Amino acid sequence: MVFVTTTNVLLSMSGAIAAIVLWKVISILRAPYTSALRNLPGPPSPSWPLGHLKMMFSAEDSAALYESWVERHGTTFKYNGWAGTYRLFTADTRAVNYIQSHSNDYWKPEISRFSLIQILGHGLLSVEGDRHRQQRRVMNPAFGPAQIRGLTEIFVEKAHKLCEFWRNELSKNGEPGRIEVLNGLSKMTLDVIGLAGFNYDFNSLNVDGKPNELNEAFNVLFRSLDGFAILPVLQAVFPPLRLLPDRRSRRIASAVKVMRRIGMELISNKKAEIVAAAISDQKEKNKLQSRDLLTLLLKSNLSRDNPESQRLSDKDVLAQVPTFLIAGHETTSNAVAWCLYALTQNSEIQQKLRDELWSVPTEDPTMDELNELPYLEAVVRETMRVHAPVPATERVAIKDDVILLNTPYIDIRGQVQDSVRVRKGDHIFIPIIAMNKSKALWGEDAFEFKPERWESIPDAVQTIPGVWANMMSFLGGAHSCIGFRFSVVEMKALVFALVRSFEFELAVPAGQLTAKTIGVQRPAVRGEQNQGCQLPLLIKVYKRN
């Protein structure tokens, strides 16, 4: 009798799973014939099962690919996803502004949220709706101008530590020495987010070369995410497949376990400090006036003065630790790497910047002193424009909607359209890098690295709905990068210290360098894929006359 009951349950479960899979398959197969996007122009699909997805994921120069599509099909068109389904591609500034300002109606796709939750938990980057607003509201105080001003000392200190790290390398091998700079930059920015985010020194830039446990976890994580894999996509679409054991998931789980263990240690230690200070004298309380991210979150969480709706649960606090460990150092380290690459391609720009940096009478500038350097500002802006660390973002419509456009398009029936109708579930691709390098917005020299352009930018650029500097690198709206001020000032501090201290040349022919996107756009060398992402430079100490 028990056997019969168990068999019936298993059969019922199998039938339910089969029904879900069948419904999903039928929905996908009929989608191209009923899609509201079917009459948009667009590039022909290179593959029925994969559409344009593999091409977009593996493109060496995604900006050039997107710009070629825009030149041929306009700023708004359709492209192909899985199994012939249609997706919306738009670089139209009015459309993008609308999507960003209606974040309740346009969420990250299921596959993105599944991947982010798998790695980060339910942190700020992976949640939507009310939960996102709650987390963002509590975290905003950590990233205001006053807070970043107080953290600049950490940025400068760790930038000097990186200079010392590289000088040590040069003393061993002579000058100019070949140094893979991405590794050092990643360690430096990890140390920064440790101190500024959690008041914890990871000491990644240790000269004895001992591997840092957290850095090793990151390396495992990003190696696991490398490449175009079908299974994670299927797991996002068909949740029962997430139960399947696979090597990639096991490696990610192992790396995440390390990140979360360190996160719990940080939270436990900080909680103990806050509780001890609460029952101690004023002197002890003054020691906890730190406004690092973790202190602010835990003070908010432990305070009885705040209404329940403004507090984060312990689970939500824990989710922010890996979120900011990854987001707080990966984007900045790669942005500075691309900045150094750009400076190797134009020695005049490099020297002009160096001359300005040496005009500052201190090697330990404040945030205000960094912000008063116009050419440094221009170089940082141009780096973030031309080499945006995150080259694109994607959203899914949560309801049927109509999106108005700045630039009309001609549909495949020859009719002019000034809006796009989307249906619930439609994917929308926003090409950050293509908008940053659009010739229609920036002029014919849009692909050139030209800091002088910031002396007078075109009027059309004012329509770009980014939170910073009329570009999309930090997005806009409710999901704009909460740490953009943090990132910009940290980047300035790094460039200030490095370019004052060293001269840089590319160690390989420029044609060998390429970009590899694993969430973040990283430099890599053709023919050296086994060495992972890297930026080898020839470095020598700058000797001022």
Swiss-Prot record:
Example of a GO cellular component annotation carried by this entry = membrane
Report the EC number(s), separated by commas if there are several: 1.-.-.-
Question: Pfam families per the record?
Answer: p450
Q: Where are the transmembrane segments?
A: 9-29
Xref: SUPFAM superfamilies: Cytochrome P450
The record's GO molecular-function terms, alphabetically, read: heme binding; iron ion binding; monooxygenase activity; oxidoreductase activity, acting on paired donors, with incorporation or reduction of molecular oxygen
Which domain of life, per UniProt?
Eukaryota
**Main localization (coarse):** membrane
User: Key word Transcription present in the record?
Assistant: no
* Location in the cell: Membrane
Pathway field of the UniProt record reads: Secondary metabolite biosynthesis
Positions annotated with a glycan in the UniProt record: N301, N436
- Positions annotated to bind heme: C481
* Keyword set, alphabetical order: Glycoprotein, Heme, Iron, Membrane, Metal-binding, Monooxygenase, Oxidoreductase, Transmembrane, Transmembrane helix
Name the enzyme group at the top EC level.
oxidoreductase
What membrane topology is annotated for this entry? Single-pass membrane protein
- Look up keyword Cytoplasm and say if it applies: no
Q: Which cofactors is this protein said to need?
A: heme
InterPro entries for the chain: Cyt_P450, Cyt_P450_E_grp-IV, Cyt_P450_sf, Cytochrome_P450_monoxygenase
Q: State the family it belongs to.
A: Belongs to the cytochrome P450 family.
Q: Which PANTHER family match?
A: CYTOCHROME P450, CYTOCHROME P450 12A4, MITOCHONDRIAL-RELATED
Q: What does this protein do?
A: Cytochrome P450 monooxygenase that is able to use carbazole as a substrate for oxidation.
* Name of the protein in question: Cytochrome P450 monooxygenase 197
Q: Which organism is it from?
A: Postia placenta (strain ATCC 44394 / Madison 698-R) (Brown rot fungus)
